[in-house]
């Protein structure tokens, strides 16, 4: 177990670098879906900012007795301002994404020295701030969908040792993870594309190989100079392709601490949505990449499940998302008009 992030107030960088022969409990506690928070706040659902002794602070891991609101403010504040409850929740949930996915991915690259990692944790037994990826009422947090990418049997992984790379020279190890040996005997290309805060391409590099029996393979390092990392945001998109098809996509975001809220202020693009029963097709019809694209069913977060969410869509790209409800759904994203 390791709780230096959260109980010891460690920076998120700590979780980016942690290693262990086997992982149990770790990560960052985060707020539930906003519908769930408003549900347990009851008559205080429209009160913000939070005040000492209110419902909001009581619904924390030790009922507000261990400075939990300060910890929430610290980790949420790496990403978002605290002007509104919605922004505070978003920042908290993004901190959980970073605090979990990087640790899991580093652990996978260390096989067999690291033999496993428990997914701490799936659900919860109390409505409030928690390490869970599904809150007490059943609403799914963003970390669930990012961990889907991190735990995919076939994926490309970049390792980071810090969250802020701005104006620094960096060398990022790139790994190919192929648990089921899907690429065995096949040629493949792993491409890494880096975007800045204008969503201009900074670097695009391809790593070619031929699949063997390895489940973990280091492909090399992605090197960036100070000019290339000088940006209020950097995004890294890792695609694994073989036989003319993209087989997986993983993506990362850094430098967000430069300015609170910057991650949600990227140049905008446009997404269309087409529904056929429980199958949702989302398409980027704009001229820029679409970041963090997700579908949801307003008012039904406690029932709603998507097959995948928080997608990166390049211009012209489409993805099909399966949902489990017949209720109305909508599409949102971090830079969607």
Q: Can you say where each PLM-predicted feature lies in the sequence?
A:
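Substrate-binding clefts and catalytic carboxylate motifs of secreted carbohydrate-active enzymes
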Residues: 2-186
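Extracellular ectodomain segments of secreted/surface proteins
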Residues: 154-169, 253-276
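A structural signal for the main folded, soluble domain(s) of proteins
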Residues: 156-158, 163-167, 182-188, 217, ...
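Short beta-strand elements of extracellular/lumenal beta-sandwich folds
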Residues: 170-178, 276-289
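Terminal connector regions
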Residues: 178, 215-267, 325-337
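Short acidic, flexible loop segments centered on an aromatic residue
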Residues: 180-198, 285-303
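Intrinsically disordered, low-complexity Pro/Gly/Ser/Thr-rich segments with frequent PxxP/GP/PP motifs
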Residues: 188-190, 195-234, 301-327
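Intrinsically disordered, low-complexity Ser/Thr/Gly-rich stretches
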Residues: 247-250, 254-261, 292-318
């Amino acid at each position: 177990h390791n709780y230096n992030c959260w109980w010891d107030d460690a920076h998120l960088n700590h979780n980016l670098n942690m290693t262990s022969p086997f992982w149990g409990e770790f990560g960052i506690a985060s707020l539930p879906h906003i519908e769930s928070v408003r549900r347990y706040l009851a008559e205080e659902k429209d009160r913000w900012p939070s005040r000492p002794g209110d419902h909001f602070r009581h619904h924390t891991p030790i009922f507000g007795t261990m400075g939990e609101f300060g910890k929430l403010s610290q980790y949420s504040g790496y990403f978002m301002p605290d002007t509104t409850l919605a922004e505070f929740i978003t920042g908290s949930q993004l901190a959980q994404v970073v605090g979990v996915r990087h640790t899991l991915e580093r652990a996978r690259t260390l096989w067999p020295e690291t033999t496993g990692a428990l997914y701490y944790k799936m659900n919860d037994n109390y409505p409030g701030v928690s390490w869970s990826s599904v809150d007490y009422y059943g609403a799914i947090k963003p970390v669930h969908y990012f961990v889907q990418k991190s735990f995919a049997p076939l994926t490309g992984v970049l390792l980071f040792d810090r969250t802020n790379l701005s104006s620094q020279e960096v060398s990022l190890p790139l790994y190919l993870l192929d648990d089921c040996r899907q690429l065995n005997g096949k040629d493949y290309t792993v491409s890494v594309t880096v975007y800045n805060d204008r969503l201009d391409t900074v670097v695009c590099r391809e790593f070619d190989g031929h699949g063997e029996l390895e489940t973990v393979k280091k492909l090399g390092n992605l090197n960036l100079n100070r000019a290339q990392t000088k940006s209020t945001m950097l995004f890294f998109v890792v695609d694994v392709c073989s036989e003319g098809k993209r087989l997986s996509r993983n993506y990362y975001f850094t430098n967000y601490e430069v300015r609170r809220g910057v991650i949600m202020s990227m140049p905008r693009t446009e997404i269309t949505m087409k529904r056929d029963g429980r199958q949702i097709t989302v398409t980027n019809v704009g001229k820029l990449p679409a970041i963090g694209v997700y579908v949801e069913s307003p008012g039904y977060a406690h029932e709603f499940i998507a097959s995948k969410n928080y997608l990166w869509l390049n211009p012209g790209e489409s993805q099909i998302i399966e949902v489990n409800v017949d209720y109305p759904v909508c599409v949102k994203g971090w830079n969607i008009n």
